[in-house]
Protein backbone atom coordinates (compact mmCIF):
# COMPACT_ATOMS: atom_id res chain seq x y z
CA UNK A 1 0.00 0.00 0.00
CA UNK A 2 1.30 3.41 -0.89
CA UNK A 3 0.48 6.42 1.17
CA UNK A 4 0.32 10.16 1.09
CA UNK A 5 0.95 11.98 4.32
CA UNK A 6 1.38 15.66 4.96
CA UNK A 7 2.73 16.75 8.30
CA UNK A 8 3.39 20.15 9.71
CA UNK A 9 7.03 20.81 10.52
CA UNK A 10 7.72 24.24 11.99
CA UNK A 11 4.65 25.64 10.28
CA UNK A 12 5.47 24.24 6.84
CA UNK A 13 3.73 21.31 5.18
CA UNK A 14 5.80 18.49 3.76
CA UNK A 15 4.00 17.02 0.76
CA UNK A 16 4.06 13.45 -0.47
CA UNK A 17 3.29 12.06 -3.92
CA UNK A 18 1.33 9.00 -4.99
CA UNK A 19 1.05 6.87 -8.14
CA UNK A 20 4.65 7.70 -8.97
CA UNK A 21 6.65 5.73 -6.43
CA UNK A 22 8.04 6.91 -3.13
CA UNK A 23 9.32 10.38 -2.70
CA UNK A 24 11.97 10.01 -0.03
CA UNK A 25 12.12 12.50 2.77
CA UNK A 26 10.03 13.93 5.55
CA UNK A 27 6.31 13.25 5.65
CA UNK A 28 6.16 10.20 3.35
CA UNK A 29 6.23 6.77 4.92
CA UNK A 30 5.07 3.37 3.72
CA UNK A 31 2.09 1.94 5.57
CA UNK A 32 1.63 -1.71 6.55
CA UNK A 33 0.15 -4.09 3.98
CA UNK A 34 -2.62 -4.77 6.50
CA UNK A 35 -4.09 -1.32 5.99
CA UNK A 36 -7.71 -2.21 6.58
CA UNK A 37 -9.98 -1.04 9.36
CA UNK A 38 -7.72 -2.38 12.07
CA UNK A 39 -4.62 -0.62 10.79
CA UNK A 40 -2.45 0.98 13.44
CA UNK A 41 -2.54 4.67 12.60
CA UNK A 42 0.35 6.99 13.23
CA UNK A 43 0.02 9.42 16.11
CA UNK A 44 0.21 13.02 14.99
CA UNK A 45 2.98 15.09 16.55
CA UNK A 46 1.47 17.47 19.10
CA UNK A 47 1.44 21.08 17.90
CA UNK A 48 2.51 24.05 19.93
CA UNK A 49 -0.24 24.94 22.34
CA UNK A 50 -0.98 21.39 23.46
CA UNK A 51 -2.37 20.81 26.94
CA UNK A 52 0.91 19.86 28.54
CA UNK A 53 2.57 23.06 27.38
CA UNK A 54 -0.04 25.77 27.56
CA UNK A 55 -2.95 24.60 29.71
CA UNK A 56 -6.06 26.76 29.38
CA UNK A 57 -6.96 28.32 26.05
CA UNK A 58 -7.75 31.74 27.46
CA UNK A 59 -9.59 33.88 24.94
CA UNK A 60 -7.78 32.43 21.93
CA UNK A 61 -9.85 30.59 19.32
CA UNK A 62 -9.35 26.89 18.75
CA UNK A 63 -6.26 26.46 16.59
CA UNK A 64 -6.89 25.17 13.09
CA UNK A 65 -10.24 26.86 12.41
CA UNK A 66 -10.88 29.27 9.58
CA UNK A 67 -11.21 32.90 10.68
CA UNK A 68 -14.69 34.35 10.42
CA UNK A 69 -15.71 36.74 7.62
CA UNK A 70 -13.09 35.58 5.14
CA UNK A 71 -13.06 37.22 1.73
CA UNK A 72 -13.10 35.07 -1.40
CA UNK A 73 -9.42 35.79 -1.95
CA UNK A 74 -8.53 34.82 1.61
CA UNK A 75 -10.50 31.57 1.33
CA UNK A 76 -8.74 30.70 -1.92
CA UNK A 77 -5.38 31.35 -0.24
CA UNK A 78 -6.38 29.17 2.73
CA UNK A 79 -7.49 26.32 0.47
CA UNK A 80 -4.34 26.55 -1.59
CA UNK A 81 -2.32 26.28 1.63
CA UNK A 82 -4.46 23.25 2.59
CA UNK A 83 -3.41 21.24 -0.47
CA UNK A 84 -1.74 18.03 0.71
CA UNK A 85 -1.16 16.42 -2.67
CA UNK A 86 -1.33 17.00 -6.44
CA UNK A 87 -0.92 14.31 -9.04
CA UNK A 88 -2.11 14.58 -12.61
CA UNK A 89 -5.68 15.90 -12.57
CA UNK A 90 -6.20 15.15 -8.87
CA UNK A 91 -5.86 17.70 -6.08
CA UNK A 92 -6.28 16.67 -2.44
CA UNK A 93 -7.09 19.18 0.32
CA UNK A 94 -7.25 18.93 4.09
CA UNK A 95 -10.47 20.92 4.57
CA UNK A 96 -10.84 23.03 7.72
CA UNK A 97 -13.83 22.35 9.96
CA UNK A 98 -16.81 24.60 9.35
CA UNK A 99 -16.31 25.20 5.62
CA UNK A 100 -19.37 24.06 3.63
CA UNK A 101 -18.77 22.27 0.36
CA UNK A 102 -21.96 23.60 -1.24
CA UNK A 103 -24.60 26.10 -0.19
CA UNK A 104 -27.13 28.66 -1.31
CA UNK A 105 -26.35 31.11 -4.13
CA UNK A 106 -24.12 33.88 -2.83
CA UNK A 107 -22.75 31.86 0.09
CA UNK A 108 -19.00 31.41 0.42
CA UNK A 109 -18.36 27.69 -0.03
CA UNK A 110 -15.69 25.39 -1.40
CA UNK A 111 -17.75 24.93 -4.56
CA UNK A 112 -18.20 28.68 -5.05
CA UNK A 113 -14.44 29.35 -5.17
CA UNK A 114 -13.40 26.37 -7.30
CA UNK A 115 -12.88 28.59 -10.39
CA UNK A 116 -10.49 30.87 -8.47
CA UNK A 117 -8.77 27.91 -6.80
CA UNK A 118 -8.28 26.25 -10.19
CA UNK A 119 -6.62 29.39 -11.54
CA UNK A 120 -4.52 29.78 -8.41
CA UNK A 121 -3.21 26.24 -8.90
CA UNK A 122 -2.40 26.90 -12.55
CA UNK A 123 -5.22 24.75 -13.96
CA UNK A 124 -6.37 26.75 -16.95
CA UNK A 125 -7.87 24.16 -19.29
CA UNK A 126 -10.25 22.36 -16.91
CA UNK A 127 -11.94 23.63 -13.77
CA UNK A 128 -11.75 21.54 -10.61
CA UNK A 129 -14.79 19.58 -9.51
CA UNK A 130 -15.53 17.83 -6.22
CA UNK A 131 -15.13 14.05 -6.23
CA UNK A 132 -15.30 13.30 -2.50
CA UNK A 133 -15.47 15.61 0.50
CA UNK A 134 -16.06 15.74 4.23
CA UNK A 135 -19.17 17.66 5.32
CA UNK A 136 -19.34 21.25 6.56
CA UNK A 137 -18.97 20.52 10.27
CA UNK A 138 -16.30 17.84 9.83
CA UNK A 139 -12.72 18.40 8.78
CA UNK A 140 -10.46 16.35 6.57
CA UNK A 141 -9.91 15.10 3.09
CA UNK A 142 -11.43 16.65 -0.02
CA UNK A 143 -10.65 15.05 -3.37
CA UNK A 144 -10.89 17.30 -6.44
CA UNK A 145 -10.31 16.54 -10.11
CA UNK A 146 -9.75 18.75 -13.14
CA UNK A 147 -10.61 15.84 -15.47
CA UNK A 148 -14.31 14.91 -15.80
CA UNK A 149 -13.44 11.37 -16.93
CA UNK A 150 -11.21 10.79 -13.89
CA UNK A 151 -13.88 12.22 -11.59
CA UNK A 152 -16.51 9.92 -13.11
CA UNK A 153 -14.24 6.87 -12.76
CA UNK A 154 -13.56 7.61 -9.10
CA UNK A 155 -17.22 8.26 -8.31
CA UNK A 156 -18.11 4.90 -9.87
CA UNK A 157 -15.38 3.28 -7.78
CA UNK A 158 -16.84 4.73 -4.56
CA UNK A 159 -20.37 3.66 -5.57
CA UNK A 160 -19.29 0.09 -6.35
CA UNK A 161 -17.32 -0.09 -3.10
CA UNK A 162 -20.40 0.94 -1.09
CA UNK A 163 -22.55 -1.65 -2.84
CA UNK A 164 -19.96 -4.30 -2.03
CA UNK A 165 -19.73 -2.96 1.56
CA UNK A 166 -16.04 -2.21 1.16
CA UNK A 167 -15.19 0.89 3.20
CA UNK A 168 -13.12 3.52 1.42
CA UNK A 169 -13.31 6.35 3.99
CA UNK A 170 -12.13 6.33 7.59
CA UNK A 171 -13.01 9.11 10.02
CA UNK A 172 -11.50 9.79 13.42
CA UNK A 173 -13.85 11.01 16.15
CA UNK A 174 -13.58 11.85 19.83
CA UNK A 175 -16.76 10.92 21.68
CA UNK A 176 -18.22 12.06 24.98
CA UNK A 177 -18.75 8.61 26.44
CA UNK A 178 -17.33 5.19 25.64
CA UNK A 179 -19.23 2.76 23.37
CA UNK A 180 -20.35 -0.45 25.08
CA UNK A 181 -18.62 -2.59 22.44
CA UNK A 182 -15.06 -2.08 21.26
CA UNK A 183 -16.06 -2.50 17.63
CA UNK A 184 -19.05 -3.38 15.53
CA UNK A 185 -21.69 -2.16 13.12
CA UNK A 186 -24.28 0.57 13.60
CA UNK A 187 -27.43 0.15 11.54
CA UNK A 188 -30.29 2.65 11.55
CA UNK A 189 -33.00 3.89 9.25
CA UNK A 190 -32.74 7.67 8.93
CA UNK A 191 -34.81 10.45 7.43
CA UNK A 192 -34.51 14.21 7.05
CA UNK A 193 -37.16 16.18 8.91
CA UNK A 194 -37.74 19.93 8.95
CA UNK A 195 -38.00 20.87 12.63
CA UNK A 196 -38.32 24.51 13.71
CA UNK A 197 -36.78 25.75 10.49
CA UNK A 198 -33.84 23.32 10.53
CA UNK A 199 -33.32 20.14 8.52
CA UNK A 200 -32.40 17.43 11.02
CA UNK A 201 -31.57 13.76 10.63
CA UNK A 202 -34.02 11.63 12.61
CA UNK A 203 -33.95 7.84 13.26
CA UNK A 204 -36.95 5.80 12.13
CA UNK A 205 -37.83 2.60 13.97
CA UNK A 206 -39.00 -0.33 11.83
CA UNK A 207 -39.48 1.63 8.60
CA UNK A 208 -42.24 0.44 6.28
CA UNK A 209 -42.00 0.09 2.52
CA UNK A 210 -43.89 3.36 2.27
CA UNK A 211 -41.30 5.04 4.51
CA UNK A 212 -38.51 3.85 2.22
CA UNK A 213 -40.33 5.20 -0.83
CA UNK A 214 -40.78 8.53 0.93
CA UNK A 215 -37.07 9.04 1.59
CA UNK A 216 -36.23 6.97 4.67
CA UNK A 217 -32.85 5.30 4.11
CA UNK A 218 -31.26 2.33 5.84
CA UNK A 219 -27.75 3.32 6.89
CA UNK A 220 -24.71 1.39 8.05
CA UNK A 221 -21.37 2.32 9.63
CA UNK A 222 -18.48 0.33 11.06
CA UNK A 223 -16.82 1.57 14.24
CA UNK A 224 -13.75 0.65 16.25
CA UNK A 225 -12.66 2.11 19.58
CA UNK A 226 -8.97 2.96 19.32
CA UNK A 227 -8.37 4.39 22.81
CA UNK A 228 -10.30 5.47 25.91
CA UNK A 229 -9.65 7.87 28.75
CA UNK A 230 -11.41 10.35 31.02
CA UNK A 231 -14.80 9.00 30.02
CA UNK A 232 -14.13 9.68 26.34
CA UNK A 233 -13.11 7.55 23.39
CA UNK A 234 -11.13 7.92 20.20
CA UNK A 235 -13.17 6.07 17.59
CA UNK A 236 -12.54 5.18 13.97
CA UNK A 237 -15.70 5.31 11.86
CA UNK A 238 -16.27 3.93 8.38
CA UNK A 239 -19.58 4.83 6.72
CA UNK A 240 -20.88 2.28 4.24
CA UNK A 241 -23.82 4.44 3.22
CA UNK A 242 -24.18 8.16 2.60
CA UNK A 243 -26.69 10.23 4.54
CA UNK A 244 -26.64 13.71 6.04
CA UNK A 245 -25.05 13.70 9.54
CA UNK A 246 -24.98 9.89 9.48
CA UNK A 247 -21.92 9.45 11.70
CA UNK A 248 -23.04 12.02 14.27
CA UNK A 249 -26.47 10.41 14.61
CA UNK A 250 -24.99 6.90 14.70
CA UNK A 251 -22.78 7.85 17.65
CA UNK A 252 -25.74 9.46 19.43
CA UNK A 253 -27.56 6.13 19.05
CA UNK A 254 -24.58 4.59 20.88
CA UNK A 255 -25.15 7.18 23.66
CA UNK A 256 -21.71 8.61 22.84
CA UNK A 257 -22.13 11.90 20.94
CA UNK A 258 -19.14 13.28 19.10
CA UNK A 259 -17.31 15.98 21.02
CA UNK A 260 -18.40 19.36 19.70
CA UNK A 261 -21.71 18.05 18.32
CA UNK A 262 -24.00 20.99 19.00
CA UNK A 263 -26.68 19.62 16.68
CA UNK A 264 -27.58 16.16 18.00
CA UNK A 265 -25.92 15.67 21.41
CA UNK A 266 -29.02 16.94 23.27
CA UNK A 267 -30.76 13.70 22.29
CA UNK A 268 -28.73 11.90 24.96
CA UNK A 269 -30.07 12.39 28.48
CA UNK A 270 -28.55 11.36 31.82
CA UNK A 271 -30.26 10.39 35.08
CA UNK A 272 -28.24 9.15 38.07
CA UNK A 273 -25.26 8.58 35.82
CA UNK A 274 -27.20 6.46 33.34
CA UNK A 275 -27.53 7.63 29.75
CA UNK A 276 -30.63 7.19 27.62
CA UNK A 277 -32.04 8.41 24.31
CA UNK A 278 -34.56 11.22 24.23
CA UNK A 279 -37.13 11.51 21.40
CA UNK A 280 -35.36 13.10 18.44
CA UNK A 281 -38.44 14.99 17.31
CA UNK A 282 -38.75 16.80 20.66
CA UNK A 283 -35.13 17.87 21.07
CA UNK A 284 -33.98 21.02 19.35
CA UNK A 285 -30.29 21.56 18.58
CA UNK A 286 -28.42 23.16 21.45
CA UNK A 287 -24.87 23.65 22.62
CA UNK A 288 -23.31 20.47 23.92
CA UNK A 289 -23.10 20.32 27.71
CA UNK A 290 -20.00 18.65 29.16
CA UNK A 291 -19.60 17.65 32.79
CA UNK A 292 -17.24 19.56 35.07
CA UNK A 293 -14.63 16.82 35.23
CA UNK A 294 -14.31 16.75 31.45
CA UNK A 295 -14.17 20.54 31.25
CA UNK A 296 -11.29 20.54 33.73
CA UNK A 297 -9.50 17.85 31.77
CA UNK A 298 -9.86 19.88 28.57
CA UNK A 299 -8.95 23.14 30.35
CA UNK A 300 -12.16 24.74 29.05
CA UNK A 301 -14.75 27.02 30.58
CA UNK A 302 -18.43 26.31 29.79
CA UNK A 303 -18.48 29.28 27.41
CA UNK A 304 -15.42 27.94 25.58
CA UNK A 305 -16.94 24.46 25.42
CA UNK A 306 -19.99 25.99 23.74
CA UNK A 307 -17.67 26.93 20.85
CA UNK A 308 -15.91 23.56 20.71
CA UNK A 309 -15.62 22.43 17.06
CA UNK A 310 -16.91 19.05 15.98
CA UNK A 311 -14.21 16.42 16.50
CA UNK A 312 -14.95 14.41 13.36
CA UNK A 313 -12.14 14.22 10.81
CA UNK A 314 -11.98 12.41 7.47
CA UNK A 315 -8.55 10.97 8.05
CA UNK A 316 -8.13 8.42 5.26
CA UNK A 317 -9.40 7.68 1.76
CA UNK A 318 -8.66 4.67 -0.40
CA UNK A 319 -8.46 5.18 -4.17
CA UNK A 320 -8.08 2.60 -6.92
CA UNK A 321 -4.65 2.01 -8.38
CA UNK A 322 -3.86 2.97 -11.95
CA UNK A 323 -4.54 -0.62 -13.05
CA UNK A 324 -7.30 -2.98 -11.94
CA UNK A 325 -4.98 -5.31 -10.00
CA UNK A 326 -2.95 -2.59 -8.32
CA UNK A 327 -3.21 -2.21 -4.57
CA UNK A 328 -5.32 0.79 -3.51
CA UNK A 329 -3.73 4.17 -3.00
CA UNK A 330 -4.12 5.59 0.51
CA UNK A 331 -4.53 9.31 1.17
CA UNK A 332 -4.03 10.57 4.73
CA UNK A 333 -4.82 13.96 6.23
CA UNK A 334 -3.27 15.02 9.55
CA UNK A 335 -5.54 15.95 12.42
CA UNK A 336 -6.37 19.62 13.05
CA UNK A 337 -4.40 21.24 15.89
CA UNK A 338 -7.48 21.54 18.15
CA UNK A 339 -8.17 17.81 17.64
CA UNK A 340 -4.58 16.88 18.54
CA UNK A 341 -4.79 19.13 21.61
CA UNK A 342 -7.92 17.31 22.78
CA UNK A 343 -6.21 13.94 22.40
CA UNK A 344 -3.30 15.25 24.43
CA UNK A 345 -5.59 16.53 27.18
CA UNK A 346 -7.48 13.24 27.40
CA UNK A 347 -4.40 11.05 27.18
CA UNK A 348 -5.62 9.42 23.96
CA UNK A 349 -3.35 8.21 21.19
CA UNK A 350 -3.74 6.85 17.70
CA UNK A 351 -1.86 3.67 18.56
Curated annotation (Swiss-Prot):
EC annotation from Swiss-Prot or TrEMBL: 5.4.99.-
GO cellular component: mitochondrial matrix; mitochondrion; ribonucleoprotein granule
Any one GO molecular-function label of the UniProt entry: pseudouridine synthase activity
InterPro entries per record: PsdUridine_synth_cat_dom_sf, PsdUridine_synth_RsuA/RluA, RluA_PseudoU_synthase
GO BP: mRNA processing; mRNA pseudouridine synthesis; positive regulation of mitochondrial translation
Keywords attached to this entry: Isomerase, Mitochondrion, mRNA processing, Phosphoprotein, Transit peptide
Residue numbers spanned by region Disordered: 33-58
Gene3D superfamilies: Pseudouridine synthase
Subcellular localization, as worded in the UniProt entry: Mitochondrion matrix
Keyword Cell division annotated: no
Principal location class: mitochondrion
Enzyme class name: isomerase
Post-translational modification Phosphoserine, affected residues: 71
Location of the transit peptide in the chain: 1-25
Subunit structure as annotated in this protein's UniProt entry: Forms a regulatory protein-RNA complex, consisting of RCC1L, NGRN, RPUSD3, RPUSD4, TRUB2, FASTKD2 and 16S mt-rRNA.
Family as reported in the entry's similarity comment: Belongs to the pseudouridine synthase RluA family.
Entry function: Catalyzes uridine to pseudouridine isomerization (pseudouridylation) of specific mitochondrial mRNAs (mt-mRNAs), a post-transcriptional modification necessary for their translation. Acts at position 390 in COXI mt-mRNA and at position 697-699 in mitochondrial COXIII mt-mRNA. As a component of a functional protein-RNA module, consisting of RCC1L, NGRN, RPUSD3, RPUSD4, TRUB2, FASTKD2 and 16S mitochondrial ribosomal RNA (16S mt-rRNA), controls 16S mt-rRNA abundance and may play a role in mitochondrial ribosome biogenesis.
Name of the featured protein: Mitochondrial mRNA pseudouridine synthase RPUSD3
Amino acid sequence: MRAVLAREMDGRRVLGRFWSGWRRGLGVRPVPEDAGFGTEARHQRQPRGSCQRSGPLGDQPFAGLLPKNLSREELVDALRAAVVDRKGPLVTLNKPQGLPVTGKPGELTLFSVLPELSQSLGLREQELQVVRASGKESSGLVLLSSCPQTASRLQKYFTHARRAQRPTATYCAVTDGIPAASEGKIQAALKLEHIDGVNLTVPVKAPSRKDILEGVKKTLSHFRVVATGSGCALVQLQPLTVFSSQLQVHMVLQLCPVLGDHMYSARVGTVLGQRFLLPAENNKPQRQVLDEALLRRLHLTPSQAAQLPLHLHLHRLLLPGTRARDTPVELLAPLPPYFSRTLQCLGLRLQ
